[in-house]
Amino acid sequence: SLKAGDVVHFKKGSAFSGNIRLRESGTAAKPIRLTSYGKGELPKFTNPSTRDASGNAITLGGEYIIVENLHFHDTPGERVSGMIIMTRLAALRIERGADHCIIRNNEFIKTGQGIMSAGEHTLITRNYLDGPSYALWRTSKSSWGPMGIHLNIGNQEVSYNTIKNFGTKDSPWGSDGGAIEIDCGRYHKKNIYIHHNYSEGNAGFIESSWDYDWPRFRQEIYNWRVSFNVCYDGQSWLFMLAP
């Protein structure tokens, strides 16, 4: 098992399929770190099945964990349906209570949902995300996704990321998806800082839900700062349903 201060090195050029879940925690002075070493392409991570940890390639269940210099790709989402999966589906997922984590300098390519975080005091920075063009699920009356970064709770910072092509026209609304989505009716939406991101080709930059939260608890937003972002997106720059 891992302990505070440990570093897990993945060799460049290697590939991993399935789920890796970290339950251990680091500390502020000695975080646990997942990173890469060697020469060549970044180590690749995927999980082709939603039956295995909801399609998460890496799941963080502990505090003070850093994930850096890894490549995530082709995690599922197409035609996936069901409310439970909506709160878990992502290439990299930070669970509720897994606070003070840092996700930096990673690549997410064709991941139905790149990063989902329910951890507070999280920093998501300097990642490159290039999404798929399909809906995560679709019916005749509704659709959902794809999304680059999905925040389930407040007290998080998203900065200096490049987020591209998370959007689909396979939707009864004409288009769906987006760069950053902030919803989950179970948790608060206070103190979110989104800055210096580059967003291109997505179905909108930021969406914050209200009646569409699941569970349907209405969480109002407080103390958001959105600044110095560059957006070349379709649909809308900001879709703010929650007051």
Pin down the residues of each PLM region.
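Parallel beta-helix/beta-solenoid
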Residues: 3, 11, 24, 29, ...
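Conserved SAM-binding loop
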Residues: 13, 108, 199
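Active-site/binding-pocket entry motifs
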Residues: 39-42, 73, 130, 164, ...
